[in-house]
């Protein structure tokens, strides 16, 4: 791992304010996954991190405590973020009843997961009252957000067993993270291992996963492949999903640290009512390939980094299964370069990035003079960002400020951020900040036209200024956190119902949307005993809009959200984990009582609902057996437009892990 050097040092047996001495007091080997200079991995539960505590290369190494010295941090592309909030931690939630990334994030108060089908087959990520298009999605710090539509952004080829943590990042420099960014981090379960998991259950559900890792000296390799399928929980909701992912890291003694990742995903799924609630016969198929390479190098007081990434996505949508209606072929290319300088006055960072987006489509973009295969339209655009940031920590205070410019087809825009923190007592941190963000219209916003929708080529970027306050406290096994925010959004893009355009939805940005929210969470976690973990969280959102227009999505935010998680261990090898959550969504939707007939409809308000999930597990040696039950109370609910989601669903599985 970069900045970890092997040397002979005494093995201290108490805390001595040295990096290695903190671990030495544990009297054991330590597996280090993500490690930053301020030991953010130890403070994850406080829901606070400074800008320098962001994700680093997740390379696992087991190191003898008496042979390790820590000299610095690995800079990463996300180091310039203003704050970092944990959404999921694999170690803390290892026994939780979660099978997919969507089910893991559903309990977080900051995130609104809106699913259209079972087991996360089609879902959107909404952050703090924003839309799915306002969410940036990162994989190990690399931006893989889809420029066509946010529907595809988190279609990433990583299974839950490979994901070590998920964080919410605020203040990401540049264009894209209007409401925030979700950073998904992967890491091996162990240094060297081979793991197989298989599961099956109701509705013809089947899941198989094979993963493993090899670590040798300065080299580490993680690889995984999986298959998930179901016959569906109602008509035309069957699905099949294939994932393949690999991540390799190598630290060259002189050349620096290299981090390579690549993956592929293929999905097909019945889309009963997914995009038009009255049509039960829709169908969709997508495939995504992605890759990135990151380089890090430290030279004295300087730290240098660079990254390059590529994502390709194919999407086929059938209004009636078997008859292709829309086809899209998108390419997203990104590159980033940055440098840090540590000096007496703090740390100064200078960086820039470039992104190129291109689409071939049957209906998005500008008409081609000659078709490109089956595609009749195409569009390309480029964006660039430059930023300068300075951060300083002294005693109990920290302060950071950044300024930058974004170069887009819509002109040049200035962006900024400012944050500060204070630690009045051990374990307690108070933080405050403000940052400016913007989002470009997606290709769908600009060009999508259908019998029910009209596009708008005059759209311009959305803009917002967000103000944050957070407080976190951790002592022994307890943690508490509070976060509150206010986002002043301008030129918000949404689909607006227009009777003067023939009763159709029109893509517009005529509104101002101010969003206020508060998030509370607390928890108790221990390694031994009967009661191992209890967490409780609550989130509240309210908005103020300057118009009474009928909009398709901006007002369908999660107004109240509360979640309770409990984990107990008994009979030596048994564990039971339960999660209970209550949801109360603002807004309404159109209900069609007769499938296939849009002439009969009624407007209904979203109703509150309750979900209870559980996992009973037995584990011994290399073997783990489990039984999962989701929506135990068989609640009837929907996240989007009256699309019914699964009732009670039982599955069972086995996981075998060989390794060290």
Task: Give each language-model segment a name.
Residues 142-171, 185:
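Short acidic/polar hinge/loop motifs at secondary-structure boundaries
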Residues 582-597, 617-660:
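C-terminal beta-signal and adjacent terminal beta-strands/loops
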Residues 392-396, 486-488, 509-592, 633, ...:
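Gram-negative outer-membrane beta-barrel transporters
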Residues 275-299, 423, 429, 436-490, ...:
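Outer-membrane beta-barrel signature, preferentially recognizing the C-terminal barrel domain
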Residues 62, 66-96, 123-124, 132, ...:
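N-terminal periplasmic "start-of-domain" segments of outer-membrane beta-barrel proteins
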Residues 102, 106-143, 164:
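Extracytoplasmic beta-strand/coil segments of soluble accessory domains associated
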Residues 230-237, 241, 251, 255-332:
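Flexible loop and strand-edge segments within Gram-negative outer membrane beta-barrel domains
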Residues 164-165, 173, 179-214, 225, ...:
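Short strand-turn segments of transmembrane beta-barrel domains in outer membranes
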């Amino acid at each position: 791992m970069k900045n970890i050097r092997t040397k002979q040092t005494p093995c201290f047996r108490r805390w001595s304010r040295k990096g290695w001495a903190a671990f030495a007091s544990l009297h054991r080997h330590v597996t280090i996954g993500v490690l930053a200079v301020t030991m953010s991995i130890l403070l994850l539960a406080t829901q606070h991190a400074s800008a320098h505590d962001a994700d680093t290369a997740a390379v696992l190494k087991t190191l003898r405590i008496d042979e390790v010295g820590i000299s610095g941090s690995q800079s990463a592309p996300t180091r310039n973020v203003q704050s970092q909030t944990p959404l999921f931690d694999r170690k803390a939630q290892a026994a939780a009843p979660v099978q997919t990334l969507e089910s893991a994030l559903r309990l977080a108060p900051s995130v609104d997961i809106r699913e259209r089908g079972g087991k996360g087959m089609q879902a959107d990520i909404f952050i703090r009252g924003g839309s799915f298009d306002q969410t940036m999605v990162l994989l190990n710090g690399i931006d893989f957000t889809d420029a066509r539509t946010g529907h595809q952004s988190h279609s990433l080829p990583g299974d839950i067993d490979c994901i070590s943590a998920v964080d919410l990042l605020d203040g990401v420099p540049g264009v894209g993270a209007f409401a925030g960014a979700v950073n998904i981090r992967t890491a091996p379960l162990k240094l060297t291992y081979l793991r197989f998991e298989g599961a099956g259950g109701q509705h013809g559900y089947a899941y198989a996963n094979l993963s493993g890792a090899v670590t040798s000296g300065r080299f580490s390799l993680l690889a995984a492949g999986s298959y998930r399928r179901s016959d569906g929980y109602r008509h035309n909701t069957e699905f099949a999903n294939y994932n393949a992912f690999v991540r390799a890291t190598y630290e060259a003694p002189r050349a620096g640290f290299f981090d390579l990742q690549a993956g592929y995903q293929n999905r097909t799924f019945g889309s009963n009512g997914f995009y038009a609630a009255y049509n039960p016969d829709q169908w969709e198929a997508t495939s995504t390939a992605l890759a990135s390479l990151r380089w890090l190098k430290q030279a004295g007081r300087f730290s240098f980094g660079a990254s390059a990434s590529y994502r390709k996505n194919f999407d086929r949508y059938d209004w009636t299964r078997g008859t292709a209606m829309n086809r899209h072929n998108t390419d997203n290319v990104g590159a980033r370069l940055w440098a840090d300088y540590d000096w007496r006055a703090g740390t100064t960072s200078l960086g820039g990035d470039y992104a190129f987006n291109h689409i071939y489509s049957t209906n998005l973009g500008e008409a081609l003079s000659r078709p490109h295969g089956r595609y009749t339209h195409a569009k390309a655009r480029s964006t660039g960002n430059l930023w300068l940031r300075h951060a300083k920590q002294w005693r109990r205070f920290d302060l950071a400020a950044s300024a930058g410019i974004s170069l887009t087809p819509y002109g040049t825009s200035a962006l900024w951020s400012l944050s500060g923190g204070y630690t009045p007592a051990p374990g307690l941190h108070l933080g405050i900040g403000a940052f400016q963000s913007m989002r470009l219209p997606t290709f769908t916003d600009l060009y999508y036209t259908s019998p029910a929708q009209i596009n708008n080529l005059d759209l311009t970027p959305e803009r917002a200024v967000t103000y944050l306050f957070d407080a976190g406290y951790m002592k022994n096994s307890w943690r508490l956190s509070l976060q509150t925010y206010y986002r002043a959004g301008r030129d918000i893009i949404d689909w607006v119902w227009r009777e003067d355009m023939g009763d159709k939805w029109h893509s517009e940005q005529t509104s101002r949307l101010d969003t206020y929210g508060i998030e509370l969470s607390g928890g108790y976690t221990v390694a031994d005993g009967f009661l191992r973990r209890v967490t409780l969280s609550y989130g509240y959102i309210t908005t103020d809009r300057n118009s009474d227009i009928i909009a398709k999505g901006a007002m369908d935010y999660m107004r109240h959200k509360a979640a309770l998680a409990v984990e107990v261990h008994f009979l030596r090898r048994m564990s039971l984990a339960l999660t209970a959550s209550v949801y109360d969504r603002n807004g309404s939707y159109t209900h069609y009582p007769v499938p296939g007939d849009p002439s009969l409809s009624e407007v209904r308000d979203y109703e509150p609902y309750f979900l209870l999930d559980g996992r009973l597990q037995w584990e011994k040696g290399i073997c783990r057996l489990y039984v999962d039950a989701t929506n135990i109370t068989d609640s009837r609910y929907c996240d989007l437009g009256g699309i019914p989601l699964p009732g009670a669903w039982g599955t069972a599985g086995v996981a075998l892990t060989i390794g060290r």
